[in-house]
Amino acid sequence: MATLQGQPVLILREGTQRTVGRDAQRMNIMAARVIAEAVRSTLGPKGMDKMLVDSLGDVVITNDGVTILKEIDVEHPAAKMIIEVAKTQDNEVGDGTTTAVVLAGELLKRAEELLDQEIHPAIIANGYRYAAEKALEILNEIAIPISKDDDEILKKIATTAMTGKGAEVAIDKLAEIAVNAVKMIAEESNGQVEVNTDYIKIEKRQGGSIEETELVDGIVLDKEVVHPGMPKRVENAKILLLDSALEVKETEIDAKIRITDPEKLQKFIEQEEAMLKEMVDKIVNAGANVVFCQKGIDDLAQYYLAKAGVLAVRRVKKSDMEKLAKATGAKVLTDLRDISSEDLGEAALVEERKVGDEKMVFVTGCKNPKAVTILVRGGTEHVVEEIARGIEDAVRAVACAVEDGKVVVGAGAPEIEVSLKLREWAPSLGGREQLAVEAFATALEIIPRTLAENAGLDPIDVLVELKAAHEKGQKYAGVDVDTGKVVDMKERGVFEPLRVKTQAIGSATEVAVMILRIDDIIAAKGLEKEKGGGGEGGMPEMPEF
């Protein structure tokens, strides 16, 4: 509400709430910090798990940052912005989501301290941008170059990504599976290695133990053979991929046929049979003995295919069809009229197997497959889900390392090194921005501090030891959460992809700067609740932060 010559002037709709200046900044910073604090206890190998129960009573148990943040329902817009940071981190690199969120929360906490000292938000924002730019430069300097053939380092990266996800009993095997999967689908072009992790299918099946998780050099489908008379096992498979139905097409116009003679009805049925027989003959004549169809297969077509000894699967998802094409070298056909043997893919074996209580179709032994499957097993549904999330993180982390050819050590070492270098560099800026750079350097310490806290160690003692080691030039010194000692993480073999750190720092800085620059919140009146929600008039309640 504004005033003109002492008279109130109503500009905003009645019920609209407006918060301005420092109150708006404090409210946004508080909301962001609450979200960061919610996931902070999950960080690191000793991080705790969260049990999430949705409105239907479904339970998710995880310590994966992005999974937690996707499941919780928040109303505050600043909190939603922090959750977007986790989603971006997950989409770009697949790991480091908790790191990004915790760092964003700490950057805002340190910014609030500067605001209390009457430092303008624009100056803090500029200082943070300078610091982030310098931090990425320092990270590149301390990064360790690797090649896609450094299997041991790649396995260590996968192990680091999976640690704390309940996979410890078989972590070496799972790490090897993740590395082999990435190496199988990696492709080189113009001297650059490219890895599209979409072509690594993670199929989950409850039953057995984690040790039974396996890498399949082909595709596993959660489907079964359509007809009992079809073979359940085909060796030296010639595979046809079809994205149209194996059925007689109906006309688009709403036509009716009046049959007056029973013989004509018989001829009509025979004509349909002949058309289906012709379709199957084309498939068989092209040399196909396995058919994967994206749509339906007519009962009669199933019979003819079974009679010809062809294994067929229907209603295959489009994404699986694309993976089958990549794995077997087949082309996805829309029309059988143009079918030839060149369109078929190859696999050493296609068979239906019983996994747990259900049947699945395995396409294995593909020559140089560019799509593979990791079949995850585990005793309970929650275990399988969490192991699958861990493997997905590991696969994405290894893919980043292979593509970039650079890694950094973990355990809080890079954050302390960058923090130290930023403090040395800050005085060269002059002006109040150096205070923001120093605040940025302090904020980075939240990562090793949290790792220590979550392991039950004294964070102050750990930070003092870490800083002392880095002051002496030990740039790979990090905290060993098992012993509480500061050790060389390069020798210990704790590695993370460089991209995980650069993306986390970049995303956290961007969202912190964006939130800092907001000085006015105008919230429209919410939809009215049922009477009793906010007194007699049913006024909407204020959202909780």
From Swiss-Prot:
The keyword rRNA processing does not apply. The keyword ATP-binding applies. CDD domains: cpn60 (cd03343). It holds the Pfam family Cpn60_TCP1. Gene3D superfamilies: GroEL, GroEL-like equatorial domain, TCP-1-like chaperonin intermediate domain. One of its GO terms (molecular function) is ATP binding. Keywords: ATP-binding, Chaperone, Nucleotide-binding. PANTHER family: CHAPERONIN. Forms a Heterooligomeric complex of two stacked eight-membered rings. Belongs to the TCP-1 chaperonin family. This is Thermosome subunit beta. It comes from Archaeoglobus fulgidus (strain ATCC 49558 / DSM 4304 / JCM 9628 / NBRC 100126 / VC-16).
